[in-house]
């Protein structure tokens, strides 16, 4: 016997289909809004990722941006040299040429007078160049894991003649490498692959982390940044804690947080360039005494990745891991393209469309 739907049943079926269609459309619309939370300990490269989004997905740095970053470059450069000078005393390193002591006093005086954001005078520039060329300063620089030094110190100090020029304008790379502590939450908007991204960069130092809670609602994915090169360094805010151990502890608390049960987690093992150089001289056993492998980039990076992945206690949660160099625009462009594809697939799956 045939099964004929009554008019009422047909109307109910049409209503059901319409509701399902609306739900799917709502799902697609929701899937187009992506809220990304950029987390990680201090100095892991989060703010550099944000700057890259400005280069890749917006119009890069404006004339006003360049103007604002210029004093930051001056400050980062002279503050880095002053940090090495101070460490000379702490570590008991002698200058190659004793006459450099007068140069070091000039540098430290400029910093103590808070004139570090101003263009370098000809006299100051000469003093800085002599200092950076000193064998004792270079020896102290090579021991930078024993004190706190900006990652970009060598980059800036190798460019002193360019940065010290009267007509100096910061390049894109100069701006990418600037270091300013993030306080509070910085929000960035951009569109990519028909998705509307809202990217939240949150201060990573311990004092800033209590502010993260405000960002927890409706997060599409978390990008968690780790400085691979921090494995043999201690924190700025607590010189008894290894930076990599701090990142692992933080990742554990984020990955297994009740707020993020259904949130995709993307792990950026960042500063791979610095790590590749450092691992040749500084063994991974400084951080992981039980590490059995060789001190090659491939083996050591793979071991660190395993340490982070093992913190995930949810059998249904996948950690998407990428080795990154946040100052390399091409690398970040390729990685972010892959991250976006993961987000699209996961969003569609969440809407039952994939």
Curated annotation (Swiss-Prot):
Residues 266-273 are annotated as: G4 motif. Transmembrane segments: none annotated. The keyword Repeat does not apply. Its main location: membrane. The modification 5-glutamyl histamine is found at residue 205. Disulfide bonds: none annotated. A lipid is attached at residues 3, 351 (S-palmitoyl cysteine). Residues 324-329 are annotated as: G5 motif. Deamidation of Asn-346 converts alpha-1 to alpha-3. Histaminylated at Gln-205 residues by TGM2. It holds the Pfam family G-alpha. GO terms for cellular component: cell body; cytoplasm; dendrite; GABA-ergic synapse; glutamatergic synapse; heterotrimeric G-protein complex; myelin sheath; parallel fiber to Purkinje cell synapse. A lipid is attached at residue 2 (N-myristoyl glycine). The keyword Heme does not apply. Residues 32-354 form the G-alpha domain. The GTPase activity is promoted by GTPAse activators, such as RGS14, RGS16 and RGS19. Residues 174-182 are annotated as: G2 motif. InterPro entries: Gprotein_alpha_I, Gprotein_alpha_su, GproteinA_insert, P-loop_NTPase. The modification Deamidated asparagine is found at residue 346. It is found in: Cell membrane; Membrane. Belongs to the G-alpha family. G(i/o/t/z) subfamily. G proteins are composed of 3 units; alpha, beta and gamma. The alpha chain contains the guanine nucleotide binding site. Forms a complex with GNB1 and GNG3. Interacts with RGS14. Interacts with RGS16. Interacts with RGS19. Interacts (when palmitoylated) with ADGRG3. This is Guanine nucleotide-binding protein G(o) subunit alpha.
